Amino acid sequence: MYLLITESPAKAKKIQGFLNENYKVLSSCGHIRDLEKKKTKVYGDPKGFGIDVDNDFKPKYVIMSEKRDVVKNLKSGSIDREIIFAADDDREGEAIAWHTANVLKSPIKKDNRIIFREISKAAIIEALKTPRQIDMNEVNSQQARRIIDRLIGFKLSPCLWKNINTKEKGLSAGRVQSALLNLVEKRDDHIRKFVPDEVYTTEGSFEEIDKKCPFTKISDIDTEDLFENFAQDRVFKKASIEEKKVKDYPEKPFITSTLQQTASRSFGFAIKHTMNIAQKLYEGGHITYMRTDSMYISDDFSKKVKKFVGDNFNSSDYCKPGAKKVKGAQEAHEAIRVTSLTKPDDLEPIEMKLYNLIYDRTVTSHMKPCEYLMYKVRVTNKDIQDDGYFTVSHKRLMYPGYKIYYDKSLKEEGKPDINETYTLEECIATQKPGNMPQYYDESSIVSLLEKTGIGRPSTYSTIVGTLDNRKYTEKRDYKEPDKEIKTLTLTKDDEIIEEEKMVKGNIQKKRIIITPLGLKVLDYLRSHFMNIIHETFTSQVENDLDLVANGELNYVDVIRKVYDSFITIVDGQMKNISRNVGDMPLLGKIKGNDIFLGDGKFGPYMKITGKKVKNMNISNYLKLVNKRTEDFTIKDAEKVMSYPKKINNNIYIFLGPHGFYMKYNGTIFTIEQRPDGEYSEEYCMGLV
């Protein structure tokens, strides 16, 4: 008699239906143990967060309070049964199996752990025939990640509480989340400072074709003069023709990150939403495991796709996909694919959308590329041949390849009609600002995380969600600035018309943008912990964890390396807390007086201590110099304190709550608001 333990109730129910009465299938409902967490007199004391720092970072695990009934059920279900652990085939799954074995006092044997990549009867039976031992390298890699993240979170968070002036509660800093926050702000900063180049394009419309053709200028002729030449002779002759074969390849099989990105672009799904649907599809036995770095598809299933392609299209359309390697990929698994080429009829509409996406990709990734023959025809005439040429493009379908999956009517096309002459109808030259950079959305965030090696696909959803939950970022639409566009048009009637118009800026939908609170937290982390929030550090930790999983590094050494990189700074920061006034951080000293930065109901201000305590509002100063509160430095404080500034015996410049103003013999004058706050005597006397 056997007890088979998986981590999901839905998965347990599905598997129970495949097995006979000798097997009982129960679920652990995820992790049943976690690091101990208890209150201590001093927050940040290692004794409070379940890690013995002085004993090789030995963890202390306790059963989670909400899982006590689950554990009780597992213990009673294991009586007189041999236990088999069937959690997911990844590091979290391996750790769940190990923790469950420890709690149930089940020995780590060579044959009590099974793995499978799809929930089907054949896959489960095969897994039971080939059991293995719980992989302690994978377990230790997961333990190292958990311990590192607990250490950083519990050690850095008190520094944030004491050094950041905010009404928000529960500030915290995580290793991976902080690295992403840093990258999000870099993009924000790049957009703030972006100055677009002017883009110039010239396009012509011809009688013989139904699309606009670009003009390539090869001289410095003025556009208006060029258009006058066009008006003199509108007939353009073929000067040259270039033929080029082009292949349009199908997309590779889905991995976690590409599924998340494609679902985001195609349906607007959030990462978490995509993964929740994929989890249901997996537990229902419709797709393979959805957390994977590998593009590999098994030979057995590829043979099924080959038959499907041959039966529905042509056997010559089949081509087995290559397994391209992804940066940081663990690649122990298959890609995300459907488990059967017969579609289910019991899915919810939202589930069917994602299922069809995976189904289509499974099939088309096994098909040959679409092939085109591209023709680029240069046309010009004797009046402008030294000034440039138009390019007329034609595309001929030579072989539909994978695209026949979407449109069975596609077939090889004949050679397009390429004229000897083309008659220009109209031409438009446009001058406009170049496109501004895009704020990140969830799809591009996934691409960024993948490119930099921060986190792993299975954690992407959590990383993005954590920043949002902590109010360090927000998801909102962003309207780009309106654009001024200048056009010069040569009409059919030989008129040359010049126009200027304002075009509304594009709306960037659902963008992830850093909040003022996120900026405060990041500014502090950059000032003191840049070494551990930089993407190269976080990526290196991920690489080290991979080496632990492969048995090439000791997990304690990885933890110690990370801990040693920040603990000295943390201790120093905690010692400096006593120098702050309440929650107000100390900027520095000016003439022996401590200067603190605060945020009140009338906006940011600086507190000057000494014989008398004085508060000075800095809201208008920040607007004048285009700075954020987080960027206000002791040098800015010195500048603010330099006012009132004497111009002569009768004239003084003041900095008040509403900006700079002038006093002349006691009379107040409104003056121009200058970021540098510098005003000459000549300027001031001109006002008088």
Kindly give the residue locations of the regions a language model identified:
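Basic, low-complexity terminal or inter-domain segments flanking catalytic cores
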Residues: 2, 14, 21, 78-81, ...
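NTP-handling and nucleic-acid-processing catalytic cores
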Residues: 1, 5, 11-14, 38, ...
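A conserved hydrophobic secondary-structure block that centers on an alpha-helix together
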Residues: 262, 266-273
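C-terminal or mid-to-C-terminal helical accessory/interaction module adjacent to the motor/catalytic core
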Residues: 119-206, 243-247
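Intrinsically disordered, low-complexity regulatory segments
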Residues: 1-152, 160, 319-322, 410-411, ...
